[in-house]
Amino acid sequence: ISVVSGFFLTTKTQKMKLLYMGLAVFFTIPFIYTLSRTSWIAVIPMVMTLMLFSYRKTVLIYFVILAVALMPILAPKIAKERISYTFQPHSSKSLKVGNIALDPSSSARIISWKECLSDFVNHPILGYGITGYGFVDGQYFRTLIELGLIGMAVLFYLLFIIFREVLSVYRNSTNDYYRGLALGMLAGCSAMFAHSIGANTF
């Protein structure tokens, strides 16, 4: 979705714009049915990145407003149920954020994050080793507990290098195709970076 959005925002022909718009809609349908809440949330930084670096911000704003307005109408029932399920407590172990109770899956994820931060101090430099701690659903927390501060620093450095190089291509290229691809990759990277908070993305 991010890549075809990048192409849509950089192409100059109406025919190609319609093609990329159609592809974006086509890709969005199965994306919604993944029922992945972390992936849905990652759309926000993806769109924000497109707005930040694209020269066609007005078009994006119109599409965002339209999408938000149509979402309650067009979203399938199963997706709405997935969202409402997030805030329904199912046991005494469900966590509360303020006055909002979370479902068991979200609660277990947050509890595991807290345990990671608590146990991290026992092996802060090199961590517990790959698979040495147990399953953790969250890339950054998993990297921190398994590879320690050194592994975390290396991960952030790699992510920074990827983003920097793709941004360089976008800013310096005069070819619309490469600029569109780079813009889409920037947005995709932002989405994956955000997705990594709540899932093992990489």
Predicted regions and their residues:
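A membrane-periplasm/extracellular boundary helix in multi-pass inner-membrane enzymes
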Residues: 31-34, 54-99, 114-122
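Loop-to-transmembrane-helix entry motif
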Residues: 55, 147-151, 197
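TM-adjacent membrane-interface loops and short helices in multi-pass inner/ER membrane proteins
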Residues: 84-143, 147-157
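Membrane-interface catalytic loops of GT-C/OST-like multi-pass glycosylation enzymes that act
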Residues: 34-39, 135-137, 198-202
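Generic recognition of well-ordered alpha-helical segments
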Residues: 4, 70, 82, 112-115, ...
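Membrane-interface micro-motifs in multi-pass membrane enzymes
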Residues: 1, 38, 144, 148, ...
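Alpha-helical transmembrane segments of multi-pass inner-membrane proteins
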Residues: 1-54, 64-67, 161-171, 177, ...
